[in-house]
Amino acid sequence: MKPIHHALVSARLFGGAVEDYVPLHNAFDMSKAALGDMRHRSALHSVDHGRMVMALIFPERIGNASRDELCIQHVHDDQGFGATLDSWLSECTVPTFARIRRKPPASLEGFLEEPAVAAAARWGGEPEDFAAICDYYALPGRVSDHPLAPAMSLNAFGIFFSEMAFGPALTITTRSGRQKYVPVRDIGECLAIARFGRLLSLKDVVETMACKDWMTGSRVARSRRRRCATAGRADLFSQEMDGQDAASSLVVTESELSCILRD
C-alpha cells in the first residue's frame, strides 16, 4: 500500500480528512528510498520501535485518531499482524560488523559509553542538549536484545531520518555564551563510527535477512477480510475515494476499534 491508501483507510476508520493522515503514513514508508525491497520495512514497520520513533515526530492526536492507533493500523495494513522489531531481526544472521567490536578512534571512544557527554565535549553546550537525539539512537535496543538492534537506527537511513524529529541542526550555546549549529547527522555519524567502525547503509544491516512470506504480504489478505468483517465495511481497503464520511458510524467502543486495527 502507498501512503495515500493507508490514509484512506484511516479516514474510513476514524473520519476526518485523508490529508491529515498522509504525513505519518508517508514517514513510515520513507525507508523504501534507502532499500528497494520489502526488507526496508524492518526500519520502521513495527508496533514497538516504529511507534516509538513516530512519537518523536508527530503529535499524540492526528486528525480524529491517536498517533498510536495510526501506527498500529499501518503495520497491520502492510504485514497483516502486529510485527515487532524482533519479528524482522529474528530472520537475520549476525554479520561480522555486529559480532566483532572494534576499538573506536580515541576521539570517539566516549560515544560508546556516555554519548551525550561525549557530544557536549566535542561540540560544546551541555549533555542535556544532546540527550534526546542520543535517546533516539538507543530506541531499538529498548525493544530488542538482538545484536543488530543498535544498527537499526545507526545506519545512513536512520541518521538522515533523525532530521524528521530534530531538524537539520541543534542550536547550542557554548560556555563562552556564543551560539552554534550542530548538524544532527554529525551526531549520528559519530555514534555509528564509534560503534561499527564505519557508516552502514540500511542494506548492510539487513543483508542477511531471510525473505519470509509474511514480509511480502502472505498474511495480509486474510487479515483484511477479518478487519472488513469486524468493521462491517467491505470497502475498508478500497482505493476509491468514497466512503470517507462513514467513520462516525463505524467505531462504537475502543475495544471494537482495537479488533479492527489489530485483526
Descriptions of predicted regions:
Residues 1-263:
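N-terminal membrane-targeting hydrophobic helices
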